[in-house]
């Protein structure tokens, strides 16, 4: 049975890549494509929007009207929009893949609560490589973390609105959890002026925003005389789109619960 996928934010950079990924993936098809109310893209053929040619599915701004045309929703938009789409999915009992970042604690709690009724994959990054890096960071932190300085450097395009990136924060959380630290108290997100010496248990973050950088993350485990760097560089958003579609296929057999790409890729059994 073919899984029908709905994509919100279909006119955005990720939305167009998601349409392409769905089009080129066996076992799935695009069921509906959505944009915000008032968007000039409403009425446009979704395939033409994504550069794959006409596919006969028009972009719409009404999820309710299209509810019978898709089984699962993929959302890479903004936090306020995602929470609205999440409420719709709970009401209609449709599963959702969330790639949006920048949620506050209240919104994260709403996602956790929704997962009692539907199945959700919520991840900061859908790249297979990045999620493998998460596991490598845990292993590096276990061996080196208590004896070195840890710094996370991330770079993205000039249009990204949140900082540090959700992926950088997830990297910090994986490291902090491994070391038994609380990232909220041990994370350092800016340094300016006379800051004093670096504390040994800090996890530092540095952010770069420039041009069209898709996404780059490097973590330093720096000791006196040597430094280990673990890096991931994305050259195309298609890696995130393919991962999200893979997550949607995996999620289609679930009834409820909150999952991430560690579950999708079965990384805990490595």
Curated annotation (Swiss-Prot):
Q: Where is the active site?
A: 156, 160
GO molecular function list: 4-hydroxy-tetrahydrodipicolinate reductase; NAD binding; NADP binding; oxidoreductase activity, acting on CH or CH2 groups, NAD or NADP as acceptor
Gene label: dapB
Highest classification ranks of the organism: Bacteria, Pseudomonadati, Pseudomonadota, Gammaproteobacteria, Pasteurellales
Supply the alphabetized keyword list: Amino-acid biosynthesis, Cytoplasm, Diaminopimelate biosynthesis, Lysine biosynthesis, NAD, NADP, Oxidoreductase
Biological process annotations from GO = diaminopimelate biosynthetic process; lysine biosynthetic process via diaminopimelate
Entry superkingdom: Bacteria
Q: Name the enzyme's class.
A: oxidoreductase
Q: Name one GO cellular component term.
A: cytosol
- Native source species: Histophilus somni (strain 2336) (Haemophilus somnus)
Name of the protein: 4-hydroxy-tetrahydrodipicolinate reductase
